[in-house]
Amino acid sequence: YDRSMLASLVYPVANPTFPYQMAKGYYPRIGEGKLNGRVTRLLVSPLLIALKKVVGDRDYLDYLRSFRYPLSGEFALRTQTLPDLRIPSDWGLEIGVLSEAWRNLAPQSVCQVEISDAYDHKHQDLSEEDASKGLSRMSTDICKAIFRKLASDGTVFTPNLFRTLKATYYRQALDLLESYYNDATMNG
C-alpha cells in the first residue's frame, strides 16, 4: 500500500461534510497480462445472479451486486459504527462486512472508492486436494456468509433449493465465462 491508496479510502469517511459511514475500496484485478479476481468472477458474480433467479428479488442481493469488487478487503469505517458491527474472522470477512453495513447503515451512507489503477496481492492456490485451504476454503466461507445473511432475513434453504441453485449457478457461470473470454480476446 502507499499513502495515496490509504488517503483515497479514508477521505470519504473522514470528511465531516460527507454523509459516508463506510467506504469500500475497489481496483482492477489485472496483473501480468491476465485478469485476476477468480473468486469474484467465477463464484460471487454468478452466485448472486443465480440467487436472484432462484430466491427472487432481494434488496440485499442487489446491494452486493452493486459493488465493483465486493471481495476487496480494503474498507474504512467511522469509529462510531464499529460497536454495532459483527465482523467475521474467516474468508467471509468482506461479504460479512458488507452484510453488516447493510444491516446497520443506510445504503446512501456507503460509498465505493477506486483506490488504485493497478494493485495486485497474494493469490491463493486452488487447493483441490484439501477443502480446508486456499480457494476451496475461501469459497466455502464466502458462500456461508451470503447464505447466513439471506437465512437471517427469512430465506429458507432446502435441499431442493440448493439443487436448483447449483444448476442455475452453473449456467450463469458458463455464460459469464464466455463473456470473460470475449473480453480477454477483444483486449488482447
Question: PLM features: what roles do these ranges have?
Answer:
Residues 125-188:
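Terminal low-complexity segments of carbohydrate-biosynthetic enzymes
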Residues 70, 91-99:
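Conserved glycosyltransferase catalytic-site signature
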Residues 29-38, 55-74:
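A recurrent flexible, glycine/aromatic-enriched loop bordering the glycosyltransferase active site
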Residues 18, 89, 99-118:
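Catalytic donor-sugar/metal-binding loop of nucleotide-sugar-dependent glycosyltransferases
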Residues 45-55, 66-85:
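Conserved nucleotide-sugar donor-binding
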Residues 1-29:
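Conserved donor-nucleotide/metal-binding helix-loop-beta segment in metal-dependent transferases, i.e.
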Residues 111-132:
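Active-site donor/metal-binding and catalytic loop motifs
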Residues 28-32, 82-83, 118-121:
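A short, flexible beta-alpha/helix-coil linker loop
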